[in-house]
Amino acid sequence: MNGGYGMQFDVLREFACHDNAEVVRLNAYVAYDTARAEADPNYAEGQRNFHSSLRDFGYKVIQKDVKRYTDAEGTAIAKANSDLDMAVDMLLQSEKLDRVLMLTGDGDFVQVVRALQNRGCRVELVAFENVSSELRREVDMFIPGWLIPNLLPIRGAPRGAPAWGEIGSRVRGVCYYHKDVEGYGFMRFLDRVDADLWISDTRRKDSPYKTAYFHDSYLLDHLEPGEIPNRDIIFEFDLHRSLRNDGLEARNIKVVARL
C-alpha cells in the first residue's frame, strides 16, 4: 500500500469496528521474497515477526511470493500480485458480511465493489497515496488513512507526547475553509472514531471531528493562491489553545500527502 508504511494493525482493527461491528474475517495479504529470505537472515526474521504480530491481532496472513521477471526492455522486475486473491476472497466471503473494509487504492477493484454492493454489502475504503478517483466515487465511504487517529504514527514524535487531539499533540487533517486575502483558515481533524463519522459539522456536539483555526504564517510549505481549501491535501500540525477564543489553533503546518 503506497504511503502506509508503519501502519498500526491493532488500530486498524479497532477502526473496522467503529460502529460496534463484529469482526468476521481479517485478511492481510503480504508479499514475501523467498530468494531474499534465503540470503538475508535479518529480512527473514523480520518478516516472521511481522506475520506473527498480524496473527496476534487476529489477522489471517495470506502470503504471496515475490516473482521476478524481465520486461521487453530488459528491466528486471520483482512483483507479488495479490489482487486476484483479494477479489475472490471478498466475493466468496461477502455472503456472511454486512460491511467490507478495503485497504487499497487500486482502481481495478471498482467492479468488485459494485458486485459487493449488489449483494447488499456496504463497502468502505481506507487508503493513503495514489488512490483511484473512480474507486473513491464507487465505495460507500472513503477516508484517507492519514486522518485516522494513531493509524500511522507521527514521525519524530517524542516519547510521552500528548495523545492525538490533546493540546500539544500533533495531528493530521484537511483545510475546509480559507481566506486568501485575509490569510487565515480552518483545519478539520478526526478527534475520535465512532459510528458517526458522517457528521463532519463540528458545530454539532455529536461530531467526532474538531476544528482548529490557523494563520497562513504557520504554513511551512508554499501553496499557490486558491489551492486551499482542498480535501485532497493532507496536513500535519501542532494543536495549541487559541489566543482568540476557547478553541484550537493549528501551528507548524506541513503538507504530508496529496491524494
Regions found by a protein language model. Name each.
Residues E166-V181:
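Structural detector for short beta-strands of small beta-barrel domains
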Residues Y218-E236:
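Short nucleic-acid-contacting surface segments enriched for D/E, G, S/T with interspersed K/R
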Residues D180-D201:
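Short aromatic-glycine-enriched beta-strand elements
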